[in-house]
């Protein structure tokens, strides 16, 4: 098992020498000094959102020609929508007359109805959604049920219609948003697919996009974040999109490693730059972890994932060409690595370098905060209450090895007072606006696959 770095001066000296040999920079003036704000931010007082919002509301509204503003601020105050409408506007693609009636029948009061609805939606397997399959069949959808190897054979090896899986996934997303009874699942599929973004127009990813949406994102949407991290990292679509399929000892590529740390786990807010890893302070939430990540973490993370590639007839035997994940030992950099204060021994077993890093990330307190803050911003407010972020992150981290981690964390957020009392703090994106309008109209329609 990887071990946290000892504070022994000898160990630190050895590790500095190792980094120096690998990167040629330790001990030189090229390291950036760690910003003092990095240390101070951990203990900085949080802004009182309620006080700040009240202060903003007291500011006068300036009106005048061409400003687009009115001189009577009271006219901007909107009446709060009924509780059912508020909940359904956040947790589904939009409220309908039928969904409002169904929600109101779930309990004797708002609290009981919300709890029942959230628990129902967090168990999508118990909700009959078979009518969607009828719509897809009527629309001529032919790729949505193909396996990864079928997609590869039909749309990658045979390239006459290589974009069909991506096109059908995209069109099916709108059909599901409008007509699915598993509404919260569809909202979270959209959330995680944006989080672990793969461009639908990417020529290498398009032929297998159905697999990415169905078997990687959708299959893990209420499951475990650590499990989803590895599923994404081993997915054919992501391996191509972020170039890890060609990441090797002789030709390293840090694209996936950098996005893994910056977008998928820590967020740019926890990026420390090009600094000496031994100068990084511990995270105040748990001193066994560093407060953020550095460029050297990116470099050694890239090395850890060398050899993670695709059976595409190029990086191995030409007969191995079915589009599935494969680990190529000759491509792997088996040397020692230092990532997030964790020393990885040289010559570890196959896949272990990468899996150790996934474990380190999934259990990191700053990763928990980043992920929970992003979920809260999706459902509650773009300026969430820090106390909700902290409590959700505690739940997320306490359950990091629980197969239902994401379900448990999401339930905590959706039953919070911040969610219950929130309203009017979010705007819909264009896709969400179209889906909500179509649901409100209640018309029956379909989108053809071609």
Q: Where are the regions that the model predicts?
A:
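N-terminal intrinsically disordered, low-complexity leader regions
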Residues: 27-50
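Short acidic, low-complexity intrinsically disordered linear motifs used
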Residues: 56-59, 64
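Structured, charged N-terminal subsegments at the starts of enzyme catalytic cores
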Residues: 157-161, 166-186, 190
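Short, flexible active-site-proximal loops enriched in glycine and acidic residues
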Residues: 184-188, 200-208, 251
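His/Asp/Glu-rich metal/cofactor-coordinating catalytic motifs and the adjacent surface-exposed loops
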Residues: 2-28, 47-49, 64-157, 161, ...
């Amino acid at each position: 098992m990887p071990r946290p770095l000892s504070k022994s001066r000898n160990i630190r000296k050895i590790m500095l020498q190792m980094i120096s040999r690998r990167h040629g920079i330790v001990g030189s003036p090229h390291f950036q000094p760690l910003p003092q704000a990095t240390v101070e931010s951990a203990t900085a007082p949080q802004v009182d959102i309620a006080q700040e919002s009240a202060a903003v509301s007291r500011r006068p509204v300036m009106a005048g020609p061409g400003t687009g503003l009115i001189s009577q601020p009271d006219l901007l105050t909107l009446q709060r929508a009924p509780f059912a409408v508020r909940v359904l506007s956040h947790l589904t693609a939009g409220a309908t007359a039928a969904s409002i009636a169904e929600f109101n029948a779930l309990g004797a009061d708002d609290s009981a109805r919300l709890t029942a609805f959230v628990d129902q939606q967090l168990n999508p397997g118990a909700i009959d959604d078979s009518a969607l399959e009828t719509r897809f069949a009527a629309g001529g959808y032919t790729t949505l049920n193909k396996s990864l190897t079928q997609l590869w054979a039909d749309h990658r090896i045979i390239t006459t219609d290589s974009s069909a899986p991506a096109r059908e996934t995209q069109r099916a997303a709108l059909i599901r948003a409008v007509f699915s009874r598993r509404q919260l699942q569809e909202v979270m599929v959209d959330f995680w697919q944006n989080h672990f973004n793969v461009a639908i127009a990417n020529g290498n990813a398009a032929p297998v996009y159905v697999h990415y949406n169905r078997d990687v994102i959708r299959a893990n949407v209420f499951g475990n974040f650590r499990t989803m991290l590895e599923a994404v990292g081993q997915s054919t679509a992501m391996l191509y999109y972020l170039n890890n399929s060609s990441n090797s000892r002789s030709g390293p590529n840090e694209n996936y490693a950098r996005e893994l740390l910056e977008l998928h786990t820590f967020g740019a807010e926890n990026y420390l730059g090009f600094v000496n890893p031994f100068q990084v302070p511990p995270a105040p939430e748990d001193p066994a972890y560093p407060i953020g990540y550095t460029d050297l973490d990116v470099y050694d993370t890239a090395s850890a994932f060398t050899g993670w590639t695709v059976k595409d007839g190029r990086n191995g035997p030409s007969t191995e060409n079915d589009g599935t994940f494969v680990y190529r030992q000759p491509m792997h950099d088996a040397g020692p690595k230092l990532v997030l204060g964790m020393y990885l021994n040289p010559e570890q077993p196959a896949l272990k370098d990468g899996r150790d890093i996934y474990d380190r990330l999934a259990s990191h307190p700053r990763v928990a905060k980043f992920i929970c803050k992003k979920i809260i911003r999706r459902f509650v407010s773009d300026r969430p209450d820090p106390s909700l972020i902290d409590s959700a992150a505690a739940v997320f981290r306490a359950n990091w090895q629980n197969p239902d981690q994401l379900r448990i964390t999401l339930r905590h957020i959706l039953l919070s007072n911040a969610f219950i009392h929130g309203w009017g703090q979010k705007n819909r994106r264009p896709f969400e606006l179209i889906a909500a309008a179509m649901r409100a109209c209640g018309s029956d329609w379909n989108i053809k696959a071609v």
